[in-house]
Amino acid sequence: MPRLPPILRLLQAPAKFTVVPKAHVSAKPAKTPTSAVEQAVGISAIVVGFMVPAGWVLAHLESYKKSSAA
């Protein structure tokens, strides 16, 4: 057990000297504003991306239960 702290120090050493570049954050408004149609398409794509797989799993839950019991 006495060897654990030196090993942990070796693992932590590279993290101390890592240089993280500055993020380029802009506080300006967008050059081309996003239209309502673009926002609707984007939001619906995200909703479909999350809900379709969840719905698939819920719709086939009984078959998953049967296959795992065998």
UniProtKB/Swiss-Prot annotation:
Residues in compartment: Mitochondrial matrix: 25-38
One Gene Ontology cellular component annotation held by this UniProt entry: mitochondrion
Biological processes per GO annotation: mitochondrial electron transport, cytochrome c to oxygen
Record: transit peptide: 1-24
Family of this protein: Belongs to the cytochrome c oxidase VIII family.
SUPFAM superfamilies (UniProt xref): Mitochondrial cytochrome c oxidase subunit VIIIb (aka IX)
Tree of life domain: Eukaryota
Keywords: Membrane, Mitochondrion, Mitochondrion inner membrane, Transit peptide, Transmembrane, Transmembrane helix
Chief location of this protein within or outside the cell: mitochondrion
Location of the protein in the cell: Mitochondrion inner membrane
A family per Pfam: COX8
Biological role stated in the UniProt entry: Component of the cytochrome c oxidase, the last enzyme in the mitochondrial electron transport chain which drives oxidative phosphorylation. The respiratory chain contains 3 multisubunit complexes succinate dehydrogenase (complex II, CII), ubiquinol-cytochrome c oxidoreductase (cytochrome b-c1 complex, complex III, CIII) and cytochrome c oxidase (complex IV, CIV), that cooperate to transfer electrons derived from NADH and succinate to molecular oxygen, creating an electrochemical gradient over the inner membrane that drives transmembrane transport and the ATP synthase.
Species of origin: Mus musculus
Protein name according to UniProt: Cytochrome c oxidase subunit 8B, mitochondrial
Membrane topology: Single-pass membrane protein
Pathway the protein contributes to: Energy metabolism; oxidative phosphorylation
Subunit organization: Component of the cytochrome c oxidase (complex IV, CIV), a multisubunit enzyme composed of 14 subunits. The complex is composed of a catalytic core of 3 subunits MT-CO1, MT-CO2 and MT-CO3, encoded in the mitochondrial DNA, and 11 supernumerary subunits COX4I, COX5A, COX5B, COX6A, COX6B, COX6C, COX7A, COX7B, COX7C, COX8 and NDUFA4, which are encoded in the nuclear genome.
Residues passing through the membrane, by range: 39-60
UniProt topological domain (Mitochondrial intermembrane) ranges: 61-70
InterPro entries (alphabetical): Cyt_c_oxidase_su8, Cyt_c_oxidase_su8_sf
Gene assigned in the entry: Cox8b
